[in-house]
A protein has these predicted regions:
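Basic amphipathic alpha-helical segments that dock to polyanions
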Residues: 29, 58-68
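Non-DNA-binding regulatory cores of transcription-related proteins
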Residues: 67-146
Length: 146
C-alpha cells in the first residue's frame, strides 16, 4: 500500500486534507528514512525541486502531520520521523517507543505494551512522579553499528 495514499485516506477519514505542500513534506520525510529537524527537512524539500518553502511553513505542516499521527517528534533531539504505521490498516493503541542509535542516528519505532507502560507509571507514582509525556525514547547502538 502506498504510504502517501494511506496518509491521504487517514486525513480524509479525519475530515482534513493532505494538501500538496503537506504531501511534499511527508514525502520528503518518508524518503529520507531518518530523523531530521524542521530546518533539515526544509532544505530537503527545497533541494528536491518542490516549490520553495520557508521553515515556518514546514513547522506548521509538521504540527498538522503530527496531529494526524503521520509523523512523530522526538523530544530528546527535536527531530521528526514519519510514522512507521501509516500504511497499516489496523489501529495502534500502544504507545510507540523509539530506539535511537548513538552512532548512525537511525531511529526504529517499536510498540510498547500497555503492561510495560503501566509498570513505568507505577514506578513513577511510587516516587511521587507524574508522567506528562508517555513517549519513550531510548538511545543505544543499532545492529548495523555493533
Amino acid at each position: 500500500v502506498d504510504v502517501i495514499s494511506s496518509a491521504e485516506q487517514k486525513c480524509a477519514d479525519n475530515g482534513v486534507k493532505l494538501t500538496k505542500r503537506r504531501k511534499q513534506v511527508l514525502t520528503a520525510l518518508v524518503e529520507c528514512n531518518a530523523a531530521v529537524s524542521a530546518y533539515e527537512l526544509t532544505e530537503l524539500c527545497n533541494q528536491q525541486g518542490y516549490t520553495a518553502m520557508p521553515a515556518m511553513s514546514v513547522y506548521r505542516i509538521l504540527d498538522f502531520l503530527e496531529g494526524q499521527s503521520l509523523v512523530h517528534r522526538l523530544s530528546t533531539t527535536n527531530k521528526y520521523i514519519a510514522c512507521s504505521h501509516i500504511s497499516c490498516q489496523h489501529s495502534h493503541f500502544r504507545r510507540p517507543q523509539f530506539l535511537i542509535c548513538n552512532d548512525c542516528t537511525r531511529v526504529q519505532e517499536v510498540d510498547v505494551t500497555s503492561e510495560t507502560l503501566s509498570a513505568i507509571e507505577r514506578v513513577a507514582a511510587d516516587v511521587g512522579f507524574n508522567l506528562s509525556d508517555k513517549q519513550l525514547e531510548v538511545s543505544g547502538t543499532c545492529s548495523d553499528c555493533k
